[in-house]
Amino acid sequence: MRILICYEESYRAYSDVLERAIGALRPEADVAACSLAEMGEQLESFNPHLVVSSRPNTVDPGARAAWYKLSPEPDEPSEACLGGRRWRTLNPPLEELLSFIDEVETLVRDGRELGGC
């Protein structure tokens, strides 16, 4: 499974920590990070199953299997989207993101065609 992490340059350290943590805790995943400015190019070349970003999908709406808008600010809501289903959460712990990754991986491994995010 491919996971792309995209944040503003001002949150580069946050992005790098997420990339390392997910890579260590989910070693079977191919994890990459980029800036928001590089997102469009990376979506095309890396073609991730899941995007974790500080922003909602405005680059290719509906074309991704899963998108997790993970706010770097604890008082701002985060939003998860999987197969078109969306839900919001406030200041989610890492375990919640890892559980979401596991759910995405199961659907990808089962070969289901996903979109809507």
How would you label these PLM feature ranges?
Residues 36-37, 53-58, 72-75:
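Short, polar loop motifs at secondary-structure junctions
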